[in-house]
UniProtKB/Swiss-Prot annotation:
Domain of life of the native organism: Bacteria
UniProt lineage: Bacteria, Pseudomonadati, Verrucomicrobiota, Methylacidiphilae, Methylacidiphilales
A Pfam family annotated for this UniProt entry: Ribosomal_L13
Name listed for the protein in its UniProt record: Large ribosomal subunit protein uL13
Sorted UniProt keywords: Ribonucleoprotein, Ribosomal protein
Role of this protein: This protein is one of the early assembly proteins of the 50S ribosomal subunit, although it is not seen to bind rRNA by itself. It is important during the early stages of 50S assembly.
Quaternary state and interactors: Part of the 50S ribosomal subunit.
The keyword Ribosomal protein belongs to this UniProt entry's keyword annotation: yes
Transmembrane segments: none
GO biological process: negative regulation of translation; translation
Length: 143
């Protein structure tokens, strides 16, 4: 019996929606990465983008476990001498509340061309409003 690999043109994509309100960032990101990658499907192939679109709402209300809210640091480097900056989650939430979820998910998907393509199917919104109601997203609960 031969192993079946799904072809890119055969993939049927669905839309899922996850509410991140009062949910732990890592657990939300893990579920989102699984859905984006397509690992929940029986036809998963590691070299084919078999994943679905994922909408994350209330991203600004996601929480960290433990003391990460005060101790975790995000860093950015401009490329110049002395150009490294560090930001706490509190500072990030004020400027870009979606970044925390996006950064966590980006770290959980492959770091190659396929991963960049997978990442385009992630839609993160600060509040509960989103423009994807026409796609009839399926609500996902975190277990």
């Amino acid at each position: 019996m031969k192993t079946y690999f799904q072809k890119p043109q055969e993939v049927q994509r669905k839309w899922y929606i996850i509410d991140a309100r009062d949910k732990i960032v890592g657990k939300v990101a893990e579920k989102v990465a699984c859905l984006l990658r397509g690992k929940h499907k029986e036809v998963f192939s590691p070299h084919v983008d078999t994943g679905d679109h994922v909408i994350v709402i209330n991203a600004s209300k996601a929480i960290f476990s433990g003391k990460k809210e005060t101790q975790k640091l995000y860093s950015a480097y401009s490329g110049y001498i002395g150009g490294q900056k560090t930001f706490s989650p509190v500072q990030i939430r004020q400027k870009r509340p979606n970044f925390i979820i996006e950064h966590a998910v980006r770290g959980m998907i492959p770091h190659n061309r396929l991963g960049r393509k997978i990442y385009t199917k992630l839609h993160v919104y600060e509040g509960s409003d989103h423009p994807h109601a026409a796609q009839k997203p399926i609500p996902v609960t975190l277990d």
